[in-house]
Amino acid sequence: MLRFRNILAAVSAVLLLGLASSYMPIATAGDLPTEKGCKTLKEADSVMKGWCAAITRRKGNCLSCHHAIVDNWPETLPPGGNIGPPFVAMGARFPNSEDLRAQIWDATAKNPNSSMPPFGKHKLISEKDIDNIVAWLSTL
């Protein structure tokens, strides 16, 4: 029985180390701008534009309801919300980016009781902003 416990402990330790080493942040120090910093970005890829749309109050403002786990969260940015589900393992949860896009475009299509506004259906944000938010979320 003791041998079994030792083997179990060793296997558990290896699995935990494997999980810990597989964590990869989406950005490095200084890469994630604040809302003010987003306004001054000259060249940004769709992922960075998606981050900016997600934190900008006049655009998606996704992080007012959702929490995202990212490294180097800007100090002046309030923590994410807890109304909607957290942005964790988004690529695994939505392997088809069109499903994620449809959820942002109109969450009430799948769940009429959803508290998430139908951003695309009501034209709250542009189609391009939705595409950029999907690009950013797919990195999480």
Where are these regions (language model features)?
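Electrostatic cytochrome c docking/interface patches
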Residues: 27-58
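C-terminal capping alpha-helices of c-type cytochrome domains
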Residues: 98, 102-111, 120-140
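Methionine-biased hydrophobic packing positions in alpha-helices, especially
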Residues: 116-118
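N-terminal export/targeting leaders of redox proteins
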Residues: 1-37
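Short sequence/structural segments immediately N-terminal
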Residues: 47, 57-59, 110-111, 140
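Gly/Gly-Pro-rich "capping" loops immediately C-terminal to redox-active cysteine motifs
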Residues: 63-105
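Substrate-binding/catalytic groove segments of enzymes
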Residues: 74, 109-114
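Short pre-active-site segment immediately N-terminal to redox-active cysteine/selenocysteine motifs
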Residues: 57-61, 69, 129
